[in-house]
């Protein structure tokens, strides 16, 4: 593609809202190619949908649906609490029970040993009631924070719903966190209670527990005969609790969820979400994931990540469908067996997992009967065009990428089932979401750019229900996210003439080289077109003449070994695909690239290690570089 290599026509300065340093934002000129031309140059044609591909889709005519959509109509799809108010857990389970759908399978949990535990909407509601009673009996009240440190265990889902029924605030954490990240998040959140395993507690919490005076109760799963002092055996407490509980009356703007997101530096930010968010969770499930009543849905996201809450718990349950939970870690054969045996119809996963499946090959996927799959979607980081197209080869349909953030609470931009897919694009905004591309002005404001394929910061008009309401106890940090009536996402993007959005990179990831603004995603995608490359991470490193030059880190597919000949071949491949101005000047081989639990390649960590800089917050690091 030539998009990022276009000549720069204008340079402005703005303040980085997180680091408070001056950075340059370069806006692209009219010399950019159109999206279609760029895709054809890469050999990736637009994937045209046939009418039979989206028969019965909830959204069939995007323009008409967007024209008539209102959040008021979306709210009317939910019941609300008897007597007034709104509660996420009530909408997720209780209203289905009251409507006579209690016998429907809500959650199927598959253990590492292939054991199965099924929860209907009625039994899930009763279990959540028991946990709500456990909290209430111990003085945990409305607004108190309840943290969880669990993997994909039934207690996590029961705990989340029971916490919300009690009017308390659910705050999940990655089970892979070490003691310090856990302590930091629970301290910021002023947590009153914690749900975790006995093993996690002994290793990760007990050594510092006395320092967090707000922590009143610790509920342990997988308890031994001799649990640690000042802890509660959750199973025993649940067995003694009533399965009747009247949901605490919460209002739409009452705090419901506290999700932490890490910046490049500094302490974690606690993004506050309210019960009103359920309006967005519900409707985006219908529109972006095309939920229908008989769907079987599998979201593979870690429950410590917001996707694991918004779309791993709330959205499928409010839509009354069946969701699959797998306790085990990734294994290609196991995943395909689950898709086949559980007859999954909608599958929501991450680019990292898709690339790992690609390593196993399309022929491996074809050994399984995956004919029930209707929609495959991806989130976590931009999905490389090659992965989108590989979906057609392996499954007969493309992966549908979408974009959102912890701060937005739900899907904002997506490739809809009934719309053509442009490989590499994020898709189009959800009805009710006003997105734009802006340039930053000298006076601190922003100006919207309407020219197709002009690069700028992706922004959103505030007002959707799942928008974060605050960074907990950090009002100034929160206010910096909003300028001139827009929410600033911190992502650079482009919008084509058809209204599709294209991710370029985080504003602090973009490489400025010899007058060119280079998006790392574009370079990574080009490298991944090569048959030897499994994944790639790209950074800019200082160079006296150009300012920065591109360096790539590459992990190879099975069957390929690092060599100088292969390094030169990849450099030549990239120059041919991207041109000399954008292609990497150096390539380093790695067995693995550092990634977060949500599957994002940690480019800033690659850069810090390359340049000997401080690594900053690495609490979300899952896979280490090697």
Q: Where is each model-derived feature located?
A:
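Structural core segment of the AMP-binding/adenylate-forming
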Residues: 22-50, 54, 137, 158-236, ...
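Conserved pre-ATP/AMP-binding loop-to-beta segment of ANL
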Residues: 103-105, 220, 225-226, 231, ...
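Conserved AMP-binding A3 loop
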Residues: 117-122, 248, 256-280
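AMP-binding/adenylate-forming catalytic core of the ANL superfamily
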Residues: 148, 180-187, 192-198, 340, ...
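Gly/Ser/Thr-rich phosphate-binding loop
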Residues: 235-238, 344-349, 358-421, 434
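Conserved AMP-binding/adenylation subdomain of ANL enzymes
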Residues: 279-299, 303-346, 359-361
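Conserved ATP/PPi-binding loop(s) of AMP-dependent carboxylate-activating enzymes
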Residues: 429-432, 443-480, 518, 613-614
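Conserved beta-loop-beta connector loops within the AMP-binding
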Residues: 436-461, 494-498, 561-567, 602
């Amino acid at each position: 593609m030539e998009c990022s290599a276009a000549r720069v026509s204008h340079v402005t300065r703005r303040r980085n809202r997180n680091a408070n340093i001056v950075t340059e934002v370069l806006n692209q000129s009219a010399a950019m190619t159109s999206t279609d031309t760029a895709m054809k140059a890469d050999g990736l044609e637009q994937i045209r949908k046939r009418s039979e591909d989206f028969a019965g889709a909830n959204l069939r005519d995007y323009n008409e649906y967007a024209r008539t959509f209102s959040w008021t109509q979306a709210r009317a799809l939910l019941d609300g609490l008897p007597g007034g108010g709104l509660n996420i857990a009530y909408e997720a389970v209780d209203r289905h029970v009251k409507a006579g759908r209690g016998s429907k399978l809500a959650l199927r949990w598959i253990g590492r040993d292939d054991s199965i535990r099924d929860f209907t909407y009625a039994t899930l509601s009763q279990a959540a009631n028991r946990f709500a009673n456990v909290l209430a009996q111990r003085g945990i009240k409305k607004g108190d924070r309840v943290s969880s440190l669990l993997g994909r265990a039934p207690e996590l889902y029961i705990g989340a719903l029971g916490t919300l029924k009690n009017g308390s605030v659910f705050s999940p954490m990655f089970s892979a966190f070490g003691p310090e990240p856990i302590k930091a998040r629970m301290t910021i959140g002023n947590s009153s209670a914690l749900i975790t395993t006995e093993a996690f507690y002994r290793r990760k919490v007990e050594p510092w527990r006395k320092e967090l005076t707000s922590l009143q109760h610790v509920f342990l799963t997988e308890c031994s005969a001799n649990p640690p002092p000042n802890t509660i055996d959750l199973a025993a407490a649940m067995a003694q609790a009533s399965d009747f509980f009247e949901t605490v009356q919460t209002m739409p703007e009452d705090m419901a969820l506290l999700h932490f997101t890490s910046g490049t530096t500094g302490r974690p930010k606690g993004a506050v979400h309210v019960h009103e968010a359920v309006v967005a969770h519900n409707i985006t499930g219908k529109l972006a994931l095309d939920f229908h009543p008989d769907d079987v849905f599998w979201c593979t996201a870690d429950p410590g990540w917001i996707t694991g809450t918004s779309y791993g718990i709330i959205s499928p349950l409010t839509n009354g469908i069946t969701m699959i939970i797998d306790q085990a870690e990734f294994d290609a054969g196991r995943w395909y067996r689950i898709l086949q045996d559980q007859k999954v119809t909608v599958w929501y996963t991450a680019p990292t997992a898709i690339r790992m499946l690609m390593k196993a090959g399309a022929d491996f996927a074809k050994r399984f009967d995956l004919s029930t799959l209707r929609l495959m979607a991806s989130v976590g980081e931009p999905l490389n065009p090659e992965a989108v197209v590989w979906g057609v080869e392996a499954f007969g349909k493309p992966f549908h990428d979408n974009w959102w953030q912890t701060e937005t609470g739900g899907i904002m931009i997506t490739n809809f089932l009934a719309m053509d897919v442009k490989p590499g694009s994020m898709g189009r905004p959800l009805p009710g979401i006003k997105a734009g591309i802006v340039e930053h002005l000298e006076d601190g404001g922003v100006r919207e750019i309407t020219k197709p394929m002009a690069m700028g910061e992706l922004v959103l008009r505030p007002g959707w229900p799942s928008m974060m309401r605050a960074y907990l106890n950090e009002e100034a940090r929160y206010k910096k996210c909003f300028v001139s009536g827009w929410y600033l996402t911190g992502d650079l993007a482009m919008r084509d003439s058809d209204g599709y959005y294209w991710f370029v990179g985080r504003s602090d990831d973009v490489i400025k080289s010899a007058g060119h603004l280079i998006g790392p995603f574009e370079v990574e995608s080009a490298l991944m077109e090569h048959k030897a490359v499994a994944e790639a991470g790209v950074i800019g490193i200082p160079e006296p003449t150009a300012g920065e030059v591109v360096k790539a880190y590459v992990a190879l597919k099975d069957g390929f070994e690092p060599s100088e000949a292969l390094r030169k071949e990849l450099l030549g491949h990239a120059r041919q695909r991207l041109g000399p101005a954008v292609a990497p000047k150096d390539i380093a081989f790695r067995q693995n690239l550092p990634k977060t639990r949500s599957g994002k390649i940690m480019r800033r960590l690659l850069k810090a290690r390359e340049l000997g800089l401080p690594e900053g917050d690495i609490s979300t690091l899952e896979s280490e570089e090697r």
